[in-house]
Amino acid sequence: MSQPWPAAEIARVILDGFDDYREHFRRITLGARERFEQARWQDIQRAAAARINLYEEKVAEVNGWLRKGFEGQVLLDVEQWPLVKNAYIRLIDPRLDDELSETWYNSLFCSLFSHDQISDGCMFIHTTRPSMRVHERAAQTRTYALTDRLKGLLRAIFADYAFDVPYGDLEADLSRLEEQLRECLPDWVCKDPQLKIELFTPVLYRNKGAYLVGRLYTPDEQWPLVIPLLHREGHGIEADALITDEAEVSIIFSFTRSYFMVDVPVPGEFVNFLKRILPGKHIAELYTSIGFYKHGKSEFYRALINHLANSDDRFVMAPGVRGMVMSVFTLPGFNTVFKIIKDRFSPSKTVDRATVIEKYRLVKSVDRVGRMADTQEFADFRFPQGKFDPECLAELLEVAPSTVSLEGDTVLIRHCWTERRMTPLNLYLEHASEGQVLEALEDYGLAIKQLAAANIFPGDMLLKNFGVTRHGRVVFYDYDEISFLTEVNFRHIPPPRYPEDEMSGEPWYSIGPHDVFPEEFPPFLFADIGQRRLFSRLHGELYDADYWKGLQEAIRAGKVIDVFPYRRKSR
């Protein structure tokens, strides 16, 4: 008599693996408070990278458990996997993180089977979870009412959010925050006896900062609220700002930032809380912002297929200069670009496909300091041919036939990255006012400086490789030539040996593979003479090799820079 197919046993192994992953994820996350209190800034960076890498490491580990525990012909009988899915659903129904466990199951399925075997019967292409569930548990938020003065309300907050390191000068902080609050909100709000503040109970940590996140509200209106805290070594903890502007808070949760460390027993409830105060953010971005980037990827994919099913949108080539390494296309009604690697690169490019993939994956694990767009990597996208503009599809088939192909009336994209769509900086400057040009070039230089101080050298710093977000921030998004700043050899151009050297079309000095000459930047970056002069006035030190060498020395000495995710006026 044949043995029953072990659907329940396979489902249990997958969920046990998820529990193991979540325990390790939580352990790293819970260490964030101690690292902040002890000012262990380099440990913070290492922990962030370790937590990102943890997911794939644990998927590989559980894949090994499954292959060891079940015979191949049993485990890999895909026709039986709807039984595994049903057994798994029964296991996760009582959980508080059940939406994440669906994504985990999908990752294990994809690690075992080729993508052409993906179906909603075998895995969770569409979620089986309700959008909002009510669980019996302790509240994840604290609420503070205005009883007398604003300062008293703020004092009550900081009494609840104490650390092992004391606040350096809490009275001064309270006075400053009260003043900022009065500047941010209408006078009637500050005097409204029904004014309340609701804060998420766990503190959010990222880089050198800790963040209290919540909202201010009256019966009629609400505003987001973020209070960033800094640990000034030797001077205690300081409340650095009070931010109520939705655009400013949105930037703090931007796709250009590293992921927060925050302990959230019920992730979906916290994401819904964030969604209420940041209605312009997609839930995919909010899940990603707190470290659940794989589930963010799931939510992104669901939003994409829903958009395609419910619109007449078609893929078109993205605006801007065609890439030398990547081909980029987009959906006009969906705020994302899709990037594929070309089969052949422009002759001036010395990288290969494997190097490009390595560079793009590197971006996931480094501190993006608000200046590099996050990416999601996908394999085996399948779309109806009718969803492509014919010229777009023809170009993709021409430049990347090993990646893009037609299977009947289906377009198969074997490998691609997605990024948030932005306006290319070169196109933005073409139509910008004088004031907008000044602001954009100021921010462009700051982006380069902040990336460099975080040990990232963009390599190709042309304007076309940077974009402008809806909030007006300049962000780098083309990663095929990035490297660690400490790997670059910055040099001054040697003086000419003879007068004839300056007239020669060839350099009179040797150039190594990692050599960079900042004096060559001005004509390389700017064809427009006016923009070149303006940028030289704003950020002329970028043309000096000694400036870059100074940054390298600071990085090698272990210095971790301060890059604030809120504008100076908020501080």
Swiss-Prot record:
Instruction: Identify the GO cellular component terms for this protein.
Output: cytoplasm
Q: Set out the biological process GO terms recorded for this chain's protein.
A: glucose metabolic process; glyoxylate cycle; tricarboxylic acid cycle
Q: Which reaction does it catalyse?
A: L-seryl-[isocitrate dehydrogenase] + ATP = O-phospho-L-seryl-[isocitrate dehydrogenase] + ADP + H(+)
Q: Which residues form the active site?
A: D374
Matching InterPro entries, A to Z? AceK_kinase, AceK_regulatory, Isocitrate_DH_AceK
- What are the protein's UniProt keywords? ATP-binding, Cytoplasm, Glyoxylate bypass, Hydrolase, Kinase, Nucleotide-binding, Protein phosphatase, Serine/threonine-protein kinase, Transferase, Tricarboxylic acid cycle
Assign the protein's first listed, main location to one coarse class: cytoplasm
Span of the signal peptide = none
Q: What does this protein do?
A: Bifunctional enzyme which can phosphorylate or dephosphorylate isocitrate dehydrogenase (IDH) on a specific serine residue. This is a regulatory mechanism which enables bacteria to bypass the Krebs cycle via the glyoxylate shunt in response to the source of carbon. When bacteria are grown on glucose, IDH is fully active and unphosphorylated, but when grown on acetate or ethanol, the activity of IDH declines drastically concomitant with its phosphorylation.
Report the protein name in the record.
Isocitrate dehydrogenase kinase/phosphatase
UniProt source species: Pseudomonas entomophila (strain L48)
